[in-house]
Amino acid sequence: MNQHSTSDKIPKTKRGRKTREKLLHAAEAEFGERGFPEASIASITQRAGVALGTFYVYFESKEEIFRALVSHMGELTRQWIGERVAESPDRLTAERRGVEAFIEFVRSNRNLYRVVSMAQFVAEDAFREYYSVFASAYEENLRRAAEAGEIREGDCEVWSWALIGMTVFLGMRFADWDEERSVEEIAAATSELVSKGMAKNA
């Protein structure tokens, strides 16, 4: 199987794109609830309400739709966060809003962690790409903020991965596991850590 052939099958018609979206949405539920080994193409098509043969118009295999789903969820997450931080007056405000947005997204899309975590073992390259795309854009945003004098200069590559790691685990604890803390409270505590650090006299 050509692991990178999914893009060749992206439909050009509105109807085709809608059907593909239905399949991806169904796959998210199927993989999230049953895991990759137990998930089946038949169940995905049943959830999507399409014929089994329709699946192969868009995807070659279960692995291919899984890979497409990981990429799709990354795009949705970045779009969701991007829209909510776009009007931020400075980088530190964007960091706080980004945490809020990510936790809100996970609370509304609980299969996110399950699917992305599975990718590490099912399709490691897709797993790496998922986070690498995030980190690359994050690093560039931090560099621009440093150039604009909004934050101090530093190792933006390391910072981007550190901030992503922090946010991912915040999402796991306060969105996937439970919702006992408010989004605003979590983001405020995170923002204080990012802006002031942990030093006593910071």
Residues covered by each model-derived region:
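Short coil/turn segments at alpha/beta junctions that flank glycine-rich nucleotide-binding fingerprints
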Residues: 33-37, 88, 109, 148
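Amphipathic alpha-helical packing segments from all-alpha helical-bundle domains
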Residues: 75-78, 124-148, 157-161, 169
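Helix-turn-helix
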Residues: 22, 30-64, 68
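Short helix-capping/turn signature of helix-turn-helix
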Residues: 59, 118-122
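Hydrophobic alpha-helical connector segments
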Residues: 68, 79-108, 159-163, 184-187
